[in-house]
Amino acid sequence: MFDFDDLSQAIARQTVLCVGDLMLDEFVYGEVSRISPEAPAPVIAVQRSEINIGGAGNVARNIAALGARCIFVGLVGDDAAAAQLEAELAREPGIETVLVRDASRPTTRKVRFVSEHFSAHMLRADWERAAPASGEIEQRLIDAIVPRLARADIVLLSDYAKGVLTARVLRNVIDAARRAGKRVIVDPKSANLAIYRGASVLTPNRKEFSEATRSRAETEQEIAAAAQDAIYLADCEAILVTQSERGMTLVPRQGDAIHVPAYPVKVRDVSGAGDTVVAVLAATLAAGAGWEEALRMASAAAAVAVSKQGTASVTSAELRRKILPHAYRAAEEKIIAGDGEILARVEGWRSEGLRVGFTNGCFDILHPGHVKVLTAARAACDRLVVGLNSDASVKRLKGESRPVQDERARAEVLAALEAVDLVAIFTEDTPLRLIELVRPSVLVKGGDYTREQVVGHEVVEAGGGEVILIDILKGHSTTALVDRARSDGR
């Protein structure tokens, strides 16, 4: 398992130059319950509609949603749809937009009519002119793209065959990127992969790959065999074939093919899922990820995207929830720092009629004695809060050589235990302030204490709570473990 948080932080430091066919996506949702008396066609009773940035613009949105910066260059007409797109893009944080206008063509617009009940697309209406851009517009696009290469860590070309990525534009951008040492990721539309020659990675879907290679490759082995000629033709590092529910297969120029299965999810809408895949792939590769890490990120992002309605983008937080094991995330969510958050969690439990318990300690090296106390404490309540001494607090109590593990490591170990429901780090020598905040119904302490010696007993008893003392498990102590380790190391 790769470190998602480290990779996510690296992604946030990247800038992706994204170029491609911009579209305005509109989704009209409604119910269908009858057939038109005028013609054998269903009648949709419209309930709502949504406007989204589509095409390469959705790729840019996905890049920004991951936390990376995006420089986006696209082509629009001189019409209302262009104004809508410009306004929508201006509202997107993390995207620097450069739009080239061509008054001779309409802004590409797609309207999809969707059955709300069945989440099924019934009809799509397109406004577009798919002809290649004129020579003048090509030059304006090149002039907008090439000077911005220096600010990018990677280049992403999203080709929907609507006229932006002509052979001339592709050649100028790819060649300039290679001279600048920048990798180029291409989501291709043309079956002639040679026009993308020199790109780093091509990402066709299964249909596009079959058309480009004139093959019916189905298995991983067949895809790998068919991809070799295509890799040579396009002079690229690798080809990634996306295969919907079958997952995705990457074939590198050198080395074995890598197949990553799809996540099992309920598919609500596939619109824009390919945009999500290529955006995540580019951002993760820019951040220094290897092939397999990038593919696993892209596969998880696709699963999130298809579970949403409409043209979807995927945030870093959503991706994190999909990739990290539930147990890891559940443990992580137990560690809370701020008083406000602690109080909100505790009050929430209390409002449900749950009995809140509290215990505390340094828990420097977790051992069976600790586990006994924690388990007994949890058995005495419905939710257990563990107060954990901070590093500075441990050092004052135990000496300069302690703690052995820092407070974050100690908190993570505690949070992984089923008996523990919340871990709160305190900086004082005693947990009295934390006990006053939590006001537990049960205060548990292990060791040779009397009730009067337990810090916070007055607070708990004044509120009608009880103090429970747990016998220590003899032969187990952190100090003894540390001393033994040091003597063995001499």
Swiss-Prot record:
<dbReference type="GO" id="GO:0097171">
    <property type="term" value="P:ADP-L-glycero-beta-D-manno-heptose biosynthetic process"/>
</dbReference>
<keyword id="KW-0119">Carbohydrate metabolism</keyword>
<comment type="function">
    <text>Catalyzes the ADP transfer from ATP to D-glycero-beta-D-manno-heptose 1-phosphate, yielding ADP-D-glycero-beta-D-manno-heptose.</text>
</comment>
<dbReference type="Pfam" id="PF01467">
    <property type="entry name" value="CTP_transf_like"/>
</dbReference>
<dbReference type="InterPro" id="IPR002173">
    <property type="entry name" value="Carboh/pur_kinase_PfkB_CS"/>
</dbReference>
<feature type="region of interest" description="Ribokinase">
    <location>
        <begin position="1"/>
        <end position="330"/>
    </location>
</feature>
<dbReference type="GO" id="GO:0005524">
    <property type="term" value="F:ATP binding"/>
</dbReference>
<protein>
    <recommendedName>
        <fullName>Bifunctional protein HldE</fullName>
        <ecNumber>2.7.1.167</ecNumber>
        <ecNumber>2.7.7.70</ecNumber>
    </recommendedName>
</protein>
<comment type="similarity">
    <text>In the N-terminal section; belongs to the carbohydrate kinase PfkB family.</text>
</comment>
<comment type="pathway">
    <text>Nucleotide-sugar biosynthesis; ADP-L-glycero-beta-D-manno-heptose biosynthesis; ADP-L-glycero-beta-D-manno-heptose from D-glycero-beta-D-manno-heptose 7-phosphate: step 3/4.</text>
</comment>
<dbReference type="InterPro" id="IPR011611">
    <property type="entry name" value="PfkB_dom"/>
</dbReference>
<dbReference type="InterPro" id="IPR004821">
    <property type="entry name" value="Cyt_trans-like"/>
</dbReference>
<dbReference type="InterPro" id="IPR011914">
    <property type="entry name" value="RfaE_dom_II"/>
</dbReference>
<feature type="region of interest" description="Cytidylyltransferase">
    <location>
        <begin position="358"/>
        <end position="490"/>
    </location>
</feature>
<dbReference type="Pfam" id="PF00294">
    <property type="entry name" value="PfkB"/>
</dbReference>
<keyword id="KW-0547">Nucleotide-binding</keyword>
<dbReference type="GO" id="GO:0016773">
    <property type="term" value="F:phosphotransferase activity, alcohol group as acceptor"/>
</dbReference>
<dbReference type="InterPro" id="IPR029056">
    <property type="entry name" value="Ribokinase-like"/>
</dbReference>
<dbReference type="InterPro" id="IPR023030">
    <property type="entry name" value="Bifunc_HldE"/>
</dbReference>
<keyword id="KW-0548">Nucleotidyltransferase</keyword>
<comment type="subunit">
    <text>Homodimer.</text>
</comment>
<keyword id="KW-0067">ATP-binding</keyword>
<keyword id="KW-0418">Kinase</keyword>
<keyword id="KW-0511">Multifunctional enzyme</keyword>
<feature type="binding site">
    <location>
        <begin position="205"/>
        <end position="208"/>
    </location>
    <ligand>
        <name>ATP</name>
    </ligand>
</feature>
<comment type="pathway">
    <text>Nucleotide-sugar biosynthesis; ADP-L-glycero-beta-D-manno-heptose biosynthesis; ADP-L-glycero-beta-D-manno-heptose from D-glycero-beta-D-manno-heptose 7-phosphate: step 1/4.</text>
</comment>
<dbReference type="GO" id="GO:0005829">
    <property type="term" value="C:cytosol"/>
</dbReference>
<keyword id="KW-0808">Transferase</keyword>
<dbReference type="GO" id="GO:0033786">
    <property type="term" value="F:heptose-1-phosphate adenylyltransferase activity"/>
</dbReference>
<dbReference type="GO" id="GO:0033785">
    <property type="term" value="F:heptose 7-phosphate kinase activity"/>
</dbReference>
<feature type="active site">
    <location>
        <position position="275"/>
    </location>
</feature>
<dbReference type="InterPro" id="IPR014729">
    <property type="entry name" value="Rossmann-like_a/b/a_fold"/>
</dbReference>
<comment type="similarity">
    <text>In the C-terminal section; belongs to the cytidylyltransferase family.</text>
</comment>
<dbReference type="InterPro" id="IPR011913">
    <property type="entry name" value="RfaE_dom_I"/>
</dbReference>
